[in-house]
Amino acid sequence: MLERIGISLEDGLLEQFDKLIAEKGYVNRSEAIRDLIRDALVQRAFTESSGREERVAVVTLVYDHDSSSLAQKLAHIQHENHRAVVSALHVHMDPHNCLEVLVLRGRGKDVVAMGESLVATKGVKYGKLVPATAGHDLG
């Protein structure tokens, strides 16, 4: 069952939001707001868990493979945590830059620790840890 709610936004904020949802292909504001709420709930569940529950996350990394031993450092972290690495994708973006996408699974605190360790490795140009969920509690 859907329940109708009302919100108040400044004109400029609403204009920016409407542009954003149009660019992303949302049919209406409601679906975009539902996605924002779901994302916030997944983030909260991931960070507020006791750390013992099994969690799944995706880590995205961009780095220069010519950077001094960086690829080896990243591989070492993955090998140290090999049970948590479900899948890894490596893409050569250009002659120097690589994209790695890792799917991690394990105890929440272990997944977060590994993901943060990879993202914080010196030489990583861009890194992000994104929690995932099966959506059982999202309605």
Swiss-Prot record:
One of its GO terms (molecular function) is DNA-binding transcription factor activity. Coiled coil: none annotated. InterPro entries: Acetolactate_synth/TF_NikR_C (IPR027271), ACT-like_dom_sf (IPR045865), Arc_rbn_hlx_hlx (IPR013321), CopG (IPR002145), CopG/NikR_regulator (IPR050192), Ni_resp_reg_NikR (IPR022988), Ribbon_hlx_hlx (IPR010985), TF_NikR_Ni-bd_C (IPR014864). One of its GO terms (biological process) is response to nickel cation. Its cofactor is Ni(2+). Binds 1 nickel ion per subunit. Ni(2+) binds at H79, H90, H92, C98. Keywords: DNA-binding, Metal-binding, Nickel, Transcription, Transcription regulation. Belongs to the transcriptional regulatory CopG/NikR family. Transcriptional regulator. This is Putative nickel-responsive regulator.
